[in-house]
A protein has these predicted regions:
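Radical SAM enzyme core and accessory elements
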Residues: 1-37, 90-92, 449, 453-527
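Canonical Radical SAM [4Fe-4S] cluster-binding loop centered on the CxxxCxxC motif
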Residues: 217-254
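N-terminal [4Fe-4S]-dependent radical SAM core
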Residues: 3, 16-24, 188-225, 270
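Conserved SAM/AdoMet-binding glycine-rich loop
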Residues: 9, 260-391, 398-400
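Glycine-rich beta-alpha loop elements in corrinoid/cobalamin-binding modules
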Residues: 60, 79-213
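Flexible glycine/acidic-rich beta-alpha junction loops that bind and position SAM and/or redox cofactors
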Residues: 106-111, 233, 272-286, 350-365, ...
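A solvent-exposed, charged loop/short amphipathic helix patch at secondary-structure junctions
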Residues: 24-51, 104-135, 361-370, 452-461
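Catalytic cores of alpha/beta
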Residues: 164-172, 329-333, 401-417
Length: 527
């Protein structure tokens, strides 16, 4: 490989890393780069590799590699590289550098939350998010610059909109931005580049056919195995909406193969059955098909247990509606995923406690229930999941199009209803995506300065961090090194305590401002 493979695939340094074995802890990459020294970067965001070739990769990047090889490109011509060791891989024969991005400019939800976390705690925010810095570091890597004359840079992944919507793809000299599912048009694009043909600056790939999606060759970070693609609930702001109705992969010949790759080659002991909505595996429409979900769970459980009793399965996403629609299914699945006294995390896009917002922007999220029932559904679903040993990681979005103060009050009311449940409530700033992607970017400071929105953000973060503290042991559980696990646990515990205390002080200030405003309004009405 002295002259380099024709295609080198990589990702932002923060995205490429397994973060010491705990992908849940990867949120640290959203911190400003001035908080992360080169020593911390190498320690926390290192990528296990052999002569620059990554041992594991982000799932999406593993899929890109598999698609290229499946399309007929030679295995020797495609390599997934550690972004910190590109000099060992890129050579004179390299013609394409493909970069997978999750947050190339630091405009994602995670970066927005981190900004609020630091700002409300009175901590300085300088520079750009580390994850964005790790992307820019690839572009200025000496080996990339050395071979730039003959090298086309292609950027893809779920956050490419950040580049195209801001025009930074041109400013940064990126040759091609690929948007959409890679399997649909990606292999043809790469072949055109290798054959010296002219290609567009932006390529829009549609939803791929299920039969055109191959199984991964390189193991995935976090033991991720995709069991479905798409969602079909039709939320206006959501990228999975662009993939259309939910499509389920067969267990035999697809899911089982990826489980084996992750266990046998990746040495992974926990398999994450990834889906935008796990409990709708096998569904043809909105309603779940419980027998198919239970059958999948049993098969996956049986397969991983064939490698040893300490091998486990987990999943990552659900909606509130499907849990309430079929609670018996949830209980049966939990017997396998959360066997014994095991607890795991599961994510839920709550998004809003306002039936008006739900009806206007994401009516499908409540189906088969009505938007008016949605707050009740959220509360009930989290209770069911807690009863089955899931800690829910819930998101609630601010600054959605058409949002009013009444909608924020509904959010606060829902937050109050959730205070005794195990749910980590992250407040998210609206970021343009999907059908709404061309709206202006969220102004984070403006939301903090608004007393009502500032109060909601602060209350949501207090709840989120309090639950995170209680679940900190679970968050670091998959870290490989017990000493590292102990260090991260204790540092995290200290930081969370400090930040929560600062937030309570801030909340008192918001309450003072709100009370003063109410008194002024009463006085005005009296006069």
């Amino acid at each position: 490989m002295s002259d380099g493979p024709k295609i080198v695939l990589t990702a932002e340094g923060a995205t490429a890393s397994e973060t010491l074995g705990s992908t849940v802890a990867g949120f640290i990459s959203a911190l400003p780069d001035n908080y992360i020294s080169s020593i911390i970067s190498k320690f926390y965001f290192g990528v296990k590799n052999k002569k620059g070739i990554a041992f594991k990769a982000p799932y999406g990047l593993s899929k890109v590699e598999a698609s290229l090889i499946y399309s007929g490109i030679s295995r020797e011509d495609v390599v997934i590289a550690d972004p910190n060791n590109l000099d060992k891989i890129i050579g004179n024969d390299t013609r394409i550098l493909g970069i997978y991005v999750m947050d190339p400019l630091g405009l994602s939800f995670g970066s927005g939350i981190t900004y609020w976390i630091l700002k409300l705690a009175g901590l300085p925010y300088q520079g750009i998010p580390y994850i964005a810095r790790s992307f820019l570091n690839i572009l200025i890597n000496p080996s990339v610059l050395k071979h730039r004359k003959y090298l086309k840079i292609v950027v893809g992944g779920p956050a490419t909109w950040q580049l195209t919507d801001t025009g930074f793809n041109k400013k940064l000299g990126i040759d091609v931005v690929y948007e959409g599912e890679f399997e649909s048009k990606g292999p043809a694009l790469f072949k055109d580049i290798l054959n010296g043909r002219d290609v567009p600056k932006i390529v829009l790939g549609g939803a791929a056919n299920l039969n055109d999606i191959p199984t991964i060759i390189t193991p995935s970070n976090g033991g991720l195995v995709e069991i479905t693609r798409g969602c079909g609930r039709g939320c206006s702001f959501c990228t999975p909406t662009l993939s259309g109705m939910i499509k389920s992969f067969p267990f035999e010949g697809h899911i089982d193969k990826e489980i084996k790759v992750n266990i046998e080659k990746g040495k992974t002991k926990d398999i994450n059955l990834h889906s935008e909505e796990f409990f709708r595996y096998g569904a043809k429409g909105i309603d779940p098909e419980p027998e198919k979900v239970i059958e999948l769970t049993k098969k996956a459980y049986k397969l991983v247990k064939s490698y040893g009793d300490d091998y486990t399965i987990s999943t990552d996403f659900t909606t509130a509606a499907v849990v309430v629609e079929s609670p018996k299914m949830v209980y049966e699945v939990a017997d396998y995923i959360n066997e014994g006294n095991r607890w795991t995390f599961i994510e839920m896009g709550i998004e809003s406690g306002s039936p008006r917002i739900i009806k206007r922007l994401m009516a499908g999220k409540a189906k088969p229930f009505t938007p008016e029932q949605y707050p009740d559904i959220v509360e009930e679903s989290i209770g069911i999941l807690n009863d089955n040993r899931w800690v829910v990681v819930g998101t609630m979005i601010l600054n959605l199009p058409g949002e009013t103060d009444d909608d924020i009050i509904k959010n606060l009311e829902l937050l109050d209803r959730l205070k005794k449940l195990k749910v980590i409530t992250w407040p998210l700033p609206f970021i343009p995506m999907g059908a709404l992607r061309h709206r202006d970017f969220t102004i984070l400071d403006k939301m903090l300065l608004d007393p009502l929105r500032g109060e909601f953000i602060t209350r949501a973060l207090i709840k989120a961090l309090s639950e995170s503290k209680d679940s900190l042991e679970l968050a670091v559980d998959k870290m490989y090194n017990p000493i590292t696990k102990s260090i991260i646990f204790n540092i995290g515990n200290y930081i969370i305590n400090y930040v929560i205390n600062r937030y309570r002080e801030t909340l008192n200030e918001y309450n003072y401002i709100k009370t003063r405003k109410q008194k002024r309004e009463i006085l005005r009405e009296t006069l």
